[in-house]
Regions:
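Hydrophobic/aromatic-rich alpha-helical bundle segments in the mid-to-C-terminal region
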Residues: 50, 158-164, 186-190
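Generic C-terminal helix-cap and adjacent flexible tail
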Residues: 298-306
Length: 306
């Protein structure tokens, strides 16, 4: 890592720490920018449903490492890498190591679909439909130019009068670099006419809105206006899951949130998220999180009291 990259990384960590008013994730004066500060181990269990990625975004850990699980895939990322996310995904993001002396600090920057289209308009090569869909969640290496643009954006938190104009300029610059970067195709494909990702987005949106309900894969294929084989192939390529696995992840992560945040018993939670059988719910919950519902809640609440 070059000295300049390390200096920018350290500056970003100081900026995030200084502007973090409380533990956890918070919005900032820049509408598209949010920051996170964790001084203790953290599991996806907040009231704001942290398992949903609602807009195309990038995530940068400026101090520490975050562990991410999507489907059956698991990876960690930190400096000098960033994560690119293009659509709603049921993910688990965890911080295993953090302290008051060295908190885990991160940045999230969201992009509007219209901004992606604006930067791609007129570029026929960039808008060309690719035969193979790209995964909607990827990790890419940060270079000095992107870190510099991020630092300029985050510095605006100390200069609120400059935010209305300069934040838009810097955000567009960062988006341009992402689009032309290693995994820019993940964002390009969601706004490209005829791209399978455009149709998969419709399927994803339907499942997110109806995950508590029973549905057939044929219905999801009809929503996406795709054949069943095509839906299966592209859904798996983009989300790392089948439609039914995607639904199951949403159900179980919402169940985890309910168990932690509300005084409900396991049977009631199972019913709330769409399970008819509490036994099946407990079995699938244990398989996904590694603990039974009760043990998992006790473990997480114990961590919160550290």
């Amino acid at each position: 890592m070059s000295n300049n990259i390390q200096q920018l990384q350290e500056e970003l960590a100081k900026l995030v720490a200084r502007n973090a008013d409380f533990e956890g994730t918070q919005t900032t004066k820049i509408p598209s920018l949010s920051i996170s500060c964790h001084t203790k181990p953290h599991y996806s269990n907040g009231i704001i449903e942290p398992y949903k990625i609602s807009k195309p975004s990038i995530y940068i850990v400026v101090q520490g490492i975050k562990e991410v699980t999507v489907g059956e895939e698991h990876f960690g990322y930190g400096s000098p890498y960033y994560m690119v996310a293009s659509m709603d995904l049921p993910i688990i993001a965890e911080v295993h190591e953090a302290s008051r002396l060295k908190p885990n600090l991160s940045i999230k920057l969201e992009f509007a679909h219209s901004s992606i289209l604006e930067l791609l308009s007129g570029d026929e090569l960039m808008m060309k439909v690719k035969k193979k869909s790209q995964r909607s969640l990827n990790v890419a290496k940060l270079d000095e130019s992107m870190l510099d643009a991020l630092a300029r954006l985050v510095r605006l938190l100390d200069k609120p009068k400059d935010i209305p104009i300069l934040s838009q300029i810097y955000t567009k610059e960062i988006l341009y670099k992402v689009l032309h970067g290693e995994h820019g195709e993940a964002l390009r494909q969601i706004v490209t006419d005829g791209s399978p990702a455009v149709y998969i987005q419709k399927a994803v949106q339907y499942i997110v809105e109806h995950y508590k309900d029973a549905f057939s894969v044929e219905l999801i294929a009809d929503v996406a206006k795709m054949s069943v084989p095509s839906l299966y192939r592209h859904f798996k390529e983009i989300t790392a899951m089948s439609p039914i696995q995607f639904q199951k992840q949403l159900r179980l992560q919402e169940a985890r949130r309910l168990l932690i945040d509300e005084p409900l018993d396991v049977g009631e939670v199972a019913s709330r998220v769409g399970y008819e059988s509490p036994t099946q719910f407990i079995r699938e919950y244990s398989r996904m999180f590694g603990f039974s519902p009760r043990k998992d809640v006790k473990r997480i609440k114990g961590l919160d009291q550290v």
